[in-house]
Amino acid sequence: MHNLPLPPSAVRLRAISRRDALRYTTALAGLGAASAACGMPTAAAAAPPRLIDFAAQQIPAQQIRAAGYSGVVNYVSLSRPGSSFGAKPITRRYADSLTAAGLVIVSNYQYGKPGGSAPSDFTRGYAGGVADARTAWQLHTAAGGGQGAPIFFTVDEDINRDTWNRVALQWFRGINSVLGVQRTGVYGGIDVCQWAAADGVIGSSGTPGRRWAWQTRAWSGHRIYPAAVLYQRVVSTKSSPGPRVGGFEVDVNDVLAPDCGQWNLHQGHRTGDAR
């Protein structure tokens, strides 16, 4: 079996025990086809494992598993005023049911939305980043999220470099001041992912060469950022609905790295206290 990549917080260790090696193997097992990265040939190895993301309702774990998915990206944020999303935020009970079914969980934060009852989160500046990071961390830990796991913060629109530099970057620096860079991830188009990495406001995956970048196909021009850990291949819209799981339309994400920020791989690795 090939050596498994360690989370960055554990890189300082010169060696790992057999017990720790087993823990990493178990943590990765939920990704199904990602077992190929551990030298385990399977028929599914040709296709990447997939995670779904959704907001409308909590989809039963067994239905997610039966549909062939390896886990979820779930919200550690509240519903906007005037809306009531059943999957926002993820709860401890639901998270436990996903884990019991052998599914992995990745955290993301999105409260506001373009044209919604609350503005896009990234427009809230440094102070907004501080507040959003504190909310995200409280909801993440309340649901059992890994102490060293990243939270992916959302830029859900097409922005240019000037807007990134003047507005979004300040928001991310506010987030960093609370969580630290290593627990900060980004969701957005390819440009946003690349800018976040270049400006040093997102952390690194335990998979060499990968960053905490969850890229959507939107605003990406059919390009995929080589350092991304997740790629949102299917974006469910009214004109192009995604597949249904448990009666609800979902977005579908390819897992591009064995360490995509899943809770169970970062459960016991602290990277400093949130402020």
Regions found by a protein language model. Give the residues of each.
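Functionally critical loop-and-helix segments that line ligand-binding/catalytic clefts
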Residues: 48-57, 61-64, 193, 198-275
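Substrate-binding cleft of extracellular glycoside hydrolase catalytic domains
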Residues: 50, 56-59, 74-158
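Active-site cleft segment of glycoside hydrolase catalytic domains centered on the general acid/base Glu
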Residues: 157-179
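Aromatic-lined carbohydrate-recognition surfaces of secreted/lumenal glycan-active proteins
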Residues: 181-195
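C-terminal region of N-terminal signal peptides and the immediate post-cleavage residues
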Residues: 16, 32-47
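N-terminal secretory signal peptides
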Residues: 1-16, 27, 33
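N-terminal module-boundary/linker segments of secreted carbohydrate-active enzymes
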Residues: 23-27, 31, 44-71
